[in-house]
Amino acid sequence: ISPFKFLRYSFIVGSLEYPSQSYMNEKWYPENTGSNDDSFFFQNNYTLNMVDLDFKHLHIDFGSSVIWPNRFAMGYMFPLANFVEYQNHVGDADNLQMFGDIKLKYQGLGEIWVSLFLDELDLSTLLKKDVFTYTRDMFAYQFGAKYVIPKLPFATLSLRYTKIEPYCYTHQSINYTPWFNHYISQNYTNDGYNIGYYLDPNSDELRLDFNIKQKKNLNLASTYQFIRHGTDYESQ
């Protein structure tokens, strides 16, 4: 929905696919579950709402999303609902996220931006200065810049750094959620893959891109990536 040229609101809701554990985690299922079917543990829906503000030299967007076990939850199906407020009323049984981007841009020169994704954050750790070591601080961030190269046809050079903190995109398995009497996995994934950035948790990336449009139907691009990945921490 775009009531004004500078304002746009987006909303999506749907069901997520569950992964096939037969090739991802062999013998993962406990023997006493009574069912060795993926749908026994993965019954999730996904909802997202986002606001975009786009001006001549400034772009801002922010929003929230939620992974929630399959049930009738009107608050997650209504476009203008506040997901955080709704979960506080129905119980802490869902996986909430918040995100935002700020970009400064100047036509003919380039742009700079900062992005933040909050999967979970303990505000008390900000005062203790251990936000980067506390296991329940699960977030990702990116900052970068793009430069328009003069005297070359539609040529740009961009540099960005991305960091995915450990446990980001993961979530503790919740037992006895509404309508379920067993553990349900609510990771930020679809069909076993992250819904967010393509990096795995506990990774960072430095990326350099060069793009040039020589002709109408000819684009040339070159990319350099330096990716580091740390220890894979287990999650429930």
Language model features with spans:
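Outer-membrane beta-barrel translocator/channel fold
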Residues: 7-58, 62-81, 161-166
